[in-house]
Each structure stands twice: as structure tokens, then as C-alpha cells.
């Protein structure tokens, strides 16, 4: 291991209703999106200092070189025009030049899972799988001997696009209403962007079957937020947080204990299914690279679900035990907070 210094890093939203901007819609061209990114980079770049830039790009790409990747298609309901099929680094380089940020040189563009693996493995040699369990979902792993060249290679699985998992009617409803029906089916069943929407469709069905008037508001997409699920999952006793959610979010001020319990159960089942499906993808990768699980494996995970959703990390561990039995003792998971950004910096430095 060597040492390197990350000169600067920053997070910024691509859409902010309060500030009145959204760079993720179809009427926004690539130039505006990357111009905004270049503007943000310019604000933290050190004047007069040439800085290599590591860029995490969390969407399916065809990689041609460390700093050359072409977007195949958007996911997570992003629709910015003129980006699909284009070289991401070239778009960023053009935007940096236009913004006169000439001292920042894009050196690496990598998937966020790859960045997470690089960051975690830099400090823990047993890390050979990395995953994002947050707004979106994807996993990569270290192939010990890739058939293309016989050398170790990080493989981006794009596991969010796995599509053989049986869907419920609620999954099908969500998928059909999405921007890309039939794509990213697993991601729509496990990721933070969609879990609240799955719960919304379940509650809409519950309201219709029970004749509840509060079901009328559940036609509104994004009505339920991830923090609502977190509060309900952590709720205990008489379920006061669930009662507050029903009153404030859905306008249901008179809820029986049975109804509150049903809502809590629905949220718990959606979260548990997510964690177990994620664990199943981990188990598949593990058994591919080490069929008998003869050595130690560490899975590095970044993302809000793993970090913040109550019980989610434990659910993944339970899912691994269910899939691998006693051999799961060879596997552990760790939080790699901001791993994707740190990993991009490492990729730019080496």
C-alpha cells in the first residue's frame, strides 16, 4: 500500500425543487447537466494546481479505458437527453473547458461499485465483493482469473438489471409505470428509490380491498418517502410512528390496531425481501469465485439502506446464512461509507 491525498470532494444534488432546478429530466440536454457538474468542480478546485479527477458514474456503461466510458442507458428514472451512447469523460472535459476549469484533468471514470471495492480493499485485503444498497442497487466482484486475459479483474455485474426473480402484482404495477418497463427489474424490487413505491402500491391495494377513503391519495407517485419506511420499521409497542404516518401522509386519522399492524407488516416484508434478494446475489458471486468457501470474504457495502434503514444490515446477514448455511461464517459485510468517491480518487491516483 502507498499513500495519496484526496485534495477535495463534494456532494451536490442534480435536482432541488426548493432551489428551482432539475437536471434529470428529458428536456435538459447533456451540456446543461455536465455544465452544472463542471461548475461544482470549479468551486472546489485549487487555483493553479493541476488536479487529476476521479469520477464516479453510477449507470450502465461500456468501458473502453480507465477514463473512457460510454453510457448505455440511464436508470433510476433519470432522463437527461443527449447522454446515452456518449463518452462520459468527453462530455465532462468539454464542460470543464467551457467553464475555464482547465487545471482539472479527468483521469478515471468508474462505476460506484468498483469505487467502493477499491476503497475498501485499499485497507482490507479480504474485500472481494462490493455493493451499493441505496437509491439504486448494483454489485461488483473481483474475478480471480478472468477468461479474457487470465488476470484478476473487477467485474461490474449490473445486478440491478437481473430479471429472472418472480414478480408480484405490485412489482408489475410499479414496473409498468416506470420510465423503462422491463428494465432494472431487480433494482425496482430492492433499491431505496423504489421500495417506498412498492409499499405505496401495496397500501393502495389494501385500501381498495378494505374500502378505505384514504386510499385515494395513493395514486400520487413518490407520496411515501424512504424516511417513512425507516420510521415504521423502527416502530414498537402501539406503533405511534405508524399512526403518525397514516395521519400525516395519508390523512387516515382513525386507524385500528389491526390496520396499523398490517401497514407495519407490509413495510417489514418489503424491506426483508429486498435484503434477502441482495444477499442472494452476494451468495451467487461468492460461490462463483470460491465454490467451497474455503477462504475469508468481506463484502463492502455503501448506501443509505445498508447504513441507515433499521435492521437492514442484519437482514442481509440473515439472508447470507439462509443461502450459505454454516459456510456463511466465512463471510462478513462492512460499511464502506462514501466508498465510491474515495475509490474514484484511488483509481485516478494509480
Task: Tell where the protein language model's regions lie, with residue ranges.
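A short acidic Gly-Thr/Ser loop motif
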Residues: 1, 58, 113-114, 132-136, ...
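Active-site nucleophile and cofactor-binding loops and adjacent substrate-binding regions
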Residues: 79-84, 105-114, 130-133, 188-191, ...
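Glycine-rich phosphate-binding loop and adjoining helix at the ATP-binding site
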Residues: 6-42, 50, 61-121, 127-129, ...
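Conserved beta-strand elements of beta-rich interaction domains across eukaryotes
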Residues: 17-19, 58-62, 136-138, 144-146, ...
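Acidic, glycine-rich loop-and-beta core segments that form the ion-binding/anion-interacting portion
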Residues: 142, 146-189
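Gly/Thr-rich phosphate-binding beta-strand-loop-beta motif of the actin/hexokinase/Hsp70
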Residues: 1-7, 63, 130-143
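ATP-binding/phosphotransfer module of carbohydrate and carboxylate kinases, centering on a glycine-rich
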Residues: 1-22, 28-51, 97, 122-123, ...
Amino acid at each position: 500500500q502507498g499513500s495519496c491525498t484526496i485534495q477535495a470532494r463534494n456532494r451536490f444534488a442534480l435536482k432541488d425543487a426548493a432551489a428551482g432546478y432539475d437536471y434529470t429530466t428529458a428536456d435538459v440536454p447533456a451540456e446543461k447537466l455536465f455544465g452544472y457538474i463542471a461548475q461544482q468542480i470549479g468551486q472546489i478546485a485549487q487555483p493553479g494546481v493541476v488536479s487529476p479527477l476521479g469520477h464516479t458514474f453510477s449507470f450502465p456503461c461500456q468501458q473502453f479505458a480507465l477514463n473512457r466510458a460510454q453510457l448505455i442507458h440511464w436508470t433510476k428514472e433519470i432522463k437527461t437527453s443527449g447522454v446515452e451512447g456518449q463518452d462520459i469523460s468527453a462530455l465532462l472535459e468539454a464542460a470543464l473547458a467551457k467553464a475555464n476549469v482547465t487545471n482539472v484533468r479527468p483521469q478515471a471514470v468508474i462505476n460506484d461499485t468498483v469505487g467502493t471495492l477499491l476503497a475498501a480493499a485499499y485497507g482490507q485485503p479480504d474485500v472481494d465483493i462490493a455493493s451499493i444498497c441505496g437509491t439504486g442497487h448494483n454489485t461488483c466482484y473481483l474475478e480471480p482469473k478472468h477468461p479474457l486475459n487470465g488476470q484478476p479483474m473487477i467485474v461490474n455485474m449490473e445486478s440491478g438489471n437481473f430479471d429472472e426473480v418472480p414478480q408480484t402484482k405490485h412489482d408489475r404495477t410499479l414496473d409498468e409505470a416506470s420510465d423503462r418497463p422491463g428494465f432494472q427489474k431487480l433494482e425496482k424490487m430492492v433499491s431505496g428509490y423504489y421500495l417506498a413505491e412498492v409499499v405505496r402500491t401495496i397500501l393502495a391495494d389494501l385500501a381498495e380491498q378494505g374500502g378505505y377513503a384514504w386510499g385515494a391519495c395513493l395514486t400520487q407517485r413518490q407520496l411515501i418517502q424512504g424516511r417513512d419506511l425507516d420510521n415504521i420499521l423502527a416502530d414498537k409497542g402501539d406503533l405511534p410512528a405508524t399512526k403518525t404516518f397514516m395521519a400525516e401522509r395519508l390523512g387516515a386519522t382513525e386507524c385500528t390496531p389491526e390496520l396499523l399492524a398490517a401497514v407495519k407488516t407490509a413495510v417489514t416484508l418489503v424491506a426483508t425481501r429486498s435484503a434477502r434478494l441482495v444477499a442472494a446475489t452476494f451468495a451467487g458471486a461468492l460461490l462463483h469465485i470460491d465454490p467451497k468457501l474455503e477462504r475469508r470474504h468481506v463484502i463492502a457495502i455503501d448506501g443509505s439502506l445498508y447504513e441507515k434503514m433499521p435492521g437492514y444490515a442484519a437482514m442481509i446477514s440473515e439472508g447470507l446464512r439462509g443461502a450459505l448455511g454454516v459456510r456463511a461464517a466465512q463471510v462478513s459485510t462492512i460499511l464502506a461509507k462514501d466508498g465510491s468517491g474515495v475509490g474514484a480518487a484511488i483509481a485516478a491516483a494509480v
